[in-house]
Amino acid sequence: MAFDKDAIIASLKEASISDLNDLVKAIEEEFDVSAAAPVAVAGAAGGDAAAKDSFTVELTEPGSAKVKVIKAVKDITGLGLKDAKDLVDGAPSAIKEDVKEDEANDIKEKLEAAGATVTLK
């Protein structure tokens, strides 16, 4: 089967957003990959006012139910299974950075429910 890159690009240009969304989901399922953007490692530079409004959720210790914690990290971050596992295995590690207080507390509750120890910074 010949691979015609230009024909594929032309087809994608003509497709609707809904069709493209379905295509991305099908590719993710077929190849067991995730199209989600990776989590930022470095926080944005900001003043004291920005620091009070944003938090970093840090996984301190995964605990004994590591599989549940990996699944929770995968769901929270949108990472693939391997990336989520690497993040949990590398604890202490930042799960999400620059999030509002409500979202940070929600993430903390989910991870603690899975058995992890979490700190907000």
UniProtKB/Swiss-Prot annotation:
GO molecular function, one term: structural constituent of ribosome
Entries under InterPro entries matching the protein: Ribosomal_bL12, Ribosomal_bL12_C, Ribosomal_bL12_C/ClpS-like, Ribosomal_bL12_oligo, Ribosomal_bL12_oligo_N_sf
Any one Gene Ontology cellular component term annotated for this protein: cytosolic large ribosomal subunit
Disulfide-linked positions: none
One GO process term, biological-process aspect: translation
Pfam families for the chain: Ribosomal_L12 (PF00542), Ribosomal_L12_N (PF16320)
Known role: Forms part of the ribosomal stalk which helps the ribosome interact with GTP-bound translation factors. Is thus essential for accurate translation.
Subunit architecture: Homodimer. Part of the ribosomal stalk of the 50S ribosomal subunit. Forms a multimeric L10(L12)X complex, where L10 forms an elongated spine to which 2 to 4 L12 dimers bind in a sequential fashion. Binds GTP-bound translation factors.
PANTHER family (UniProt xref): 39S RIBOSOMAL PROTEIN L12, LARGE RIBOSOMAL SUBUNIT PROTEIN BL12M
Entry protein name: Large ribosomal subunit protein bL12
